Amino acid sequence: MKGSASESPSASVAEATTTDVQVTPTALLQLDREQIRKAVEVISNRSKSKKNNNELLLSGSENLFLMVILWKIPEKELRVKVPLPHSILSESSDVCLFTKDEFDSPEQTEGFYKKLLKKHGVNTISQIIPFKTLKTEYKAYEAKLRLLGSFEVFITDARIRRHLPSHIGRHFYQRKKVPVSVNLLAKNLSKEINRCITGTVLNISKRGSCSTIRIGHTGMETEHIVDNILAVSEMLSEKLPEKWQSVKLLFLKTEKSVSLPIFSSFVTSQDENAVSLRSLRKQELKKRKRENAKLKKESKMLRKKSKKATSLLTQSGLASSAPAKSPGAQKKKTNKAHKKQKVTEECEEAIPQLVPIGETPDKENVKMQENITGKTPKSKSDPSTPKGKKRKALLATETPEASAPGTSGKKQKKDVQEFRKPEASSFSTPRKSGKKASNTPRDKKTKAAHSN
């Protein structure tokens, strides 16, 4: 019983470790060491063949870089110092150190730091440049390019590192020779400097998904280069936001060579039955598309419902407003029709009857006018007082008594009275014509005398 109890925890631990490896795969499990060795041998053989053809031009060794391609562009820049098991510096490589201005003159500061390095036993640094000399002597563009080409590695004091980008220029960042910060006040200074020189810097920018890391040179042994690549890949699996799952592709190359593939997340050599990240991402994309389609359908339904509601409201508003306005409109139309009929009847029947001067109309004539027009005759207004707009009066035709047979045989023209559309408020009686036939007894006598 005790033996079984003692064996059970170990078995559970083993199961837990296997499940952890399956869930979160590390770089050592995913990478193939033989594939990396083959790629390193191909690149080193190519560089050696170039040296044999051009011995004078290519005397030194070429730098090797590991190109990392991520699935996603990171939101923040990542800069990590990666310690390597084997130094990436060659025997002929030079190291430059940028220091703080401890004294007024740059010569005094240079001598001070040389003594400090000798005290700690550091012999790898070839030149010391104070910050004051960097600002004055290397201000020109050509001087910066000369400085960049003369050294392989640049180290700077951590106290002045934030001031360097404005003075060294963009070419240091393009050539991947960014100065590495060192704490010159550390107690074990030799160990600190050797760690910076032998190691490399992991720079992953947020501008793109591709970045390169220096991992050695062609003069190194193949096994040493393979060890450095594995160390960098382990650091990637720890420092990246999604660990090793964020790595898409890994390539090995020099500055001017073709990139050779080392790792691909689509097909891995160790886990053949494992689900690839590509399929997982396709599933995620399908889910997102389904969710987006559902949201679109819901939005369309809501829009249709809102349109229906607005149309119903408009229809109900029109239906409620139509019966309220219809009786008034009908009344107005009927009133206008009645008024038009009255105006036409008055225009046709408002021609006044001629009455001889001096004779007042009798009651019978008044009754006759009332029967014809349906209104009592109004009293004449004074011509001096204008009532509204003036109306043109028709010339009344002469009576058969006034027209003498011997005066003229021509037919007398009948002037037609023009009526304007009367206003609804009041109707003025038309004025009589200016030329009137006189029917007085005196005139009759004169006419009879002429006829005789």
From Swiss-Prot:
One of its GO terms (cellular component) is nucleolus. It comes from the Eukaryota. Residues 330-341 have a biased composition (Basic residues). The modification N-acetylmethionine is found at residue 1. InterPro entries: eL8/uL1-like, Ribosomal_uL1-like, Ribosomal_uL1/biogenesis, Ribosomal_uL1_3-a/b-sand. The keyword Ubl conjugation applies. Residues 283-452 are annotated as: Disordered. The modification Phosphothreonine is found at residues 334, 344, 360, 399, 407, 429. There is a cross-link at residues 119, 253 (Glycyl lysine isopeptide (Lys-Gly) (interchain with G-Cter in SUMO2)). Residues 309-319, 425-440 have a biased composition (Polar residues). It holds the Pfam family Ribosomal_L1. One of its GO terms (molecular function) is mRNA 5'-UTR binding. GO terms for biological process: regulation of apoptotic process; regulation of cellular senescence; regulation of protein localization. CDD domains: Ribosomal_L1 (cd00403). The modification Phosphoserine is found at residue 433. Transmembrane segments: none annotated. Residues 292-301, 414-423 have a biased composition (Basic and acidic residues). Residues 277-350 form a coiled coil. Belongs to the universal ribosomal protein uL1 family. Highly divergent. Interacts with ING1. Interacts with KPNA7 and KPNA2. Regulates cellular senescence through inhibition of PTEN translation. Acts as a pro-apoptotic regulator in response to DNA damage. This is Ribosomal L1 domain-containing protein 1. It comes from Mus musculus (Mouse).
